[in-house]
């Protein structure tokens, strides 16, 4: 199985960290691993589990690419210890892995950010359920008296290679 990391990069103003809560949904476009078929608008969450056909295992998302297919593609959402973490103000200009997807028979090729982000300011102010579907967010921190923003949100997927 392949572990693919979703990595983000953004310009932060008066923001100390950006994260997603455990169990949130990710809206993905997935591609068949050995063909050109894709599915857009696929929602996956670590809180959903489905039994795998002909196996004792479970997955957070399953898909048969054709009705008569005997093979099931699947994906598990997972945090990777010492790898996935919140994006912080110190990460300017770098892509940071925020979540991992363990995949078999499919791979994520795009992500559509939505709401649910948790944004923290240096003053201690916390905004929950922030919507980044427009790839930017602006607000005002009353504690510090400063504007706060997330701009130019970008993302990419990377295959995770465990260090030995």
Segments and roles (model prediction):
Residues 13-27, 31-110:
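Structured domain cores in non-transmembrane regions
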